[in-house]
């Protein structure tokens, strides 16, 4: 799906390690009004982020208008409200909704139900915390000809639950399990054209919820070439930033001809 599984640890995180990483990043990266603290796990799982480190992390984040962390919908412990009270800016919690497709949900085995996701959104809303969600394009169990529609249905579910921002992530292979699912004809790699279709339709479909396409490793998606990739990437970047449709450049390559056909 994504490559964050590469960075998970076999043992609980040692106290102080995350604080040191954050201090290093703040010293070496340009200033920004927002900060994402994505830790390849769940921010409010004390095995991943020791609870004793939360006040120190919040202290280092006082200058930011928005602090974004990732968390599982079923981890709803007191640390969430405590951390929200510590940070100076708005806290936003990102959750991997992924899909509402029943078969795909079973294959992904994220260990939460749609009701769990809704309950998490309601709980965060009660605490005054914004919600963000990740939605997968063509996860295992979703057929290619249905995948765009299922993304749009999943986005609608997120919107209904008050999610502020959804990121559409093309499902990627590479972790072993995905290769096995490919052999079983349960997973088909999505194309760049599908991602374009998703974003075009999504930004026209929601008034308040921001929808963006994840562009990392875009060159690994099928259906693009050296002639068209740069132009299509720039177009997606423009739509991500403006939340408005952007015209396609008229390019002479077989990829674009296939899309037009």
Question: Which role fits each region the language model picked out?
Answer:
Residues 68, 102-110, 137-145, 182-186:
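Surface-exposed cleft-lining segments at the edges of enzyme active sites
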Residues 38, 54, 63-74, 114-115, ...:
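Conserved N-terminal glycine/acidic-rich loop preference
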Residues 41-43, 73-75, 99-101, 137-141, ...:
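Active-site-proximal loop/turn and secondary-structure-junction residues that shape catalytic pockets
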């Amino acid at each position: 799906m994504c490559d964050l599984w590469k960075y998970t640890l076999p043992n609980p995180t040692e106290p102080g390690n995350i604080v040191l990483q954050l201090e290093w990043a703040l010293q070496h990266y340009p200033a920004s009004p927002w900060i994402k603290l994505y830790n390849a796990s769940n921010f409010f799982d004390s095995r991943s982020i020791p609870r004793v480190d939360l006040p120190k992390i919040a202290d280092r984040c006082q200058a930011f208008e928005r602090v974004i962390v990732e968390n599982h919908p079923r981890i709803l412990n007191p640390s969430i409200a405590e951390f929200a009270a510590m940070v100076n800016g708005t806290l936003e919690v990102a959750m991997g909704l992924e899909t509402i497709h029943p078969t795909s949900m079973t294959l992904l085995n994220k260990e939460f139900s749609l009701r769990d996701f809704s309950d998490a959104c309601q709980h965060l809303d009660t605490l005054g915390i914004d919600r963000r969600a990740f939605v997968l394009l063509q996860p295992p169990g979703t057929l290619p000809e249905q995948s765009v529609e299922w993304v749009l249905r999943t986005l609608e579910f997120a919107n209904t639950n008050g999610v502020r921002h959804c990121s559409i992530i093309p499902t990627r292979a590479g972790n072993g399990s995905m290769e096995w699912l490919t052999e079983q004809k349960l997973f088909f790699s999505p194309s760049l054209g599908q991602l374009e279709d998703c974003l075009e339709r999504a930004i026209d479909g929601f008034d308040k919820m921001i929808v963006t396409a994840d562009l990392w490793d875009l060159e690994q998606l099928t259906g693009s070439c050296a002639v068209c990739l740069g132009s299509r990437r720039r177009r997606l970047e423009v739509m991500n930033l403006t939340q408005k449709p952007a015209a396609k450049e008229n390019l002479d390559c077989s990829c674009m001809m296939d899309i037009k056909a």
